């Protein structure tokens, strides 16, 4: 239900990014908090290890949440589900035949030729169907470009099997932890211009303990942050890594892929398309992508950590014009759904980060005194504590779920 960011800004600090805002008596708790900002909004980041989205042993879909999923198992599951509706050809593309600015056909390694009106390029950074695409580099706005990733087994499942993702800031970057039923997916994100891959592997294995993971078990992932200026180009639509990538923080890669898929579905729902639709698609994607870049960049905007990596971040950090405007307007008008930047992340996400990074936020215009606001917040927190006391732990739920 949240992402936990320990040691961001400075060691010992904690930042929480819940997936929803808290409401009590039909009043948004963020609005009340804006009247009494001395009361820490961090108290609403639930580090207690219970699962708040469970209702009668099922997922309560009325509460925003995320899944910790084994990607390989998910791919197998989807493939099994669609096999009667979609023709699956398991082969590699060896030749892309083009006519002017469009793809005419694909020749596969198994000898099959594929002809289509519209092609979706999900071939990753290589972008086999549109390798000469015009790209927009983000190297001057982002700070990491490499990760080493692996799997660790639980040592203390009750402490480590959390109902949230962790992004732990460390001296050379940050470490993600994604606990699933049987193990923890984890990786170290860093800048290879500052830290070598071998040094990063050594740091990462020391972090977890070499009895849990060793350098030979780690996969190296490289990228250059960028986005495709025209992801819909002719009759090719680039989706996923072929359209752009920021970095692993906040899972924007998956979110952007889903956004593209839904936008494409919207544009071709009548089984027709033209240059106007493709240009609108490209414009909407660029605006959405830029909003994600600004939100991720915000995470790095204030740091007092002094290691070489974090000093590089603070020395080279630049606010985009858009991010500067968001910060400035938030100090004049409290961000709400009707008065906040459009994009992947709602007003609540911006509030949680801006407030916990101690950017100035305006008071919301609600009819309540500062004294009443404090009483309201204390009462709300008491309610949360009462609810948490009645919930089963995340680990208990997973054990129960395995038996049903």
Label each PLM-derived region with a short phrase.
Residues 87-89, 216-219, 237:
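General small-molecule cofactor/ligand-binding pocket signal
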Residues 266-404:
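Long, low-complexity C-terminal extensions of enzymes
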Residues 4-12, 159, 207, 267:
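Extended charged low-complexity segments that act as oligomerization/scaffolding linkers
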Residues 20, 43, 48-54, 58, ...:
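Extended, composition-driven regions rather than compact fold-specific motifs
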Residues 1-52:
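Dinucleotide-binding Rossmann-like beta1-alpha1 core, especially the glycine-rich loop
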Residues 63-206, 261:
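Predominantly flavin-linked oxidoreductase catalytic cores and closely associated redox partners
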Residues 226-292:
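Conserved mid-domain beta->alpha element of the FAD-binding
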Residues 170-223, 244-255, 267-270, 274:
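Conserved FAD/dinucleotide-binding core of flavoprotein oxidoreductases
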């Amino acid at each position: 239900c949240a992402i936990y960011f320990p040691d961001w800004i400075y060691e010992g600090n904690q930042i929480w990014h819940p997936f929803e805002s808290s409401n009590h008596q039909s009043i948004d708790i963020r609005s009340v908090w804006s009247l009494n900002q001395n009361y820490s909004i961090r108290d609403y980041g639930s580090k207690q290890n219970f699962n708040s989205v469970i209702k009668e042993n099922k997922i309560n879909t009325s509460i925003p949440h995320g899944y910790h999923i084994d990607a390989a198992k998910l791919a197998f599951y989807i493939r099994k589900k669609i096999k009667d509706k979609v023709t699956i050809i398991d082969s590699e593309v060896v030749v892309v035949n083009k006519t002017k600015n469009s793809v005419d056909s694909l020749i596969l390694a198994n000898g099959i030729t594929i002809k289509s009106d519209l092609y979706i390029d999900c071939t990753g950074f290589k972008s086999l169907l549109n390798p000469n695409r015009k790209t927009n580099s983000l190297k001057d706005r982002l700070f990491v470009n490499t990760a080493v990733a692996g799997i660790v087994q639980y040592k203390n499942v009750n402490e480590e099997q959390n109902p949230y993702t962790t992004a732990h800031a460390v001296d050379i970057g940050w470490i993600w932890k994604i606990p699933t039923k049987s193990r923890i997916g984890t990786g170290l994100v860093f800048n290879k211009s500052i830290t070598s891959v071998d040094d990063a592997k050594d740091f990462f294995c020391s972090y977890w303990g070499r009895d849990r993971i060793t350098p030979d078990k780690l996969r190296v992932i490289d990228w250059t942050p960028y986005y495709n200026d025209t992801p819909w180009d002719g009759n090719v639509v680039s989706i996923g890594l072929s359209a752009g990538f920021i970095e692993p923080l906040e899972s924007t890669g998956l979110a952007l892929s889903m956004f593209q898929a839904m936008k494409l579905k919207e544009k071709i729902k009548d089984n027709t398309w033209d240059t106007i639709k493709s240009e609108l698609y490209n414009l909407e994607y660029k605006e959405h992508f830029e909003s994600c870049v600004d939100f991720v960049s915000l995470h790095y905007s204030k740091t007092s950590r002094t290691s070489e990596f974090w000093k590089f971040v603070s020395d080279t950090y630049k606010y985009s014009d858009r991010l500067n405007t968001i910060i400035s307007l938030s100090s004049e008008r409290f961000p709400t759904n009707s008065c906040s930047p459009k994009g992947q992340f709602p007003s609540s996400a911006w509030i949680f980060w801006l407030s916990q990074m101690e950017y100035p936020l305006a008071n919301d215009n609600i009819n309540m005194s500062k004294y009443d606001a404090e009483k309201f917040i204390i009462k709300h927190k008491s309610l949360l504590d009462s609810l948490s006391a009645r919930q089963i732990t995340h680990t208990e739920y997973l054990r129960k779920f395995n038996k049903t």
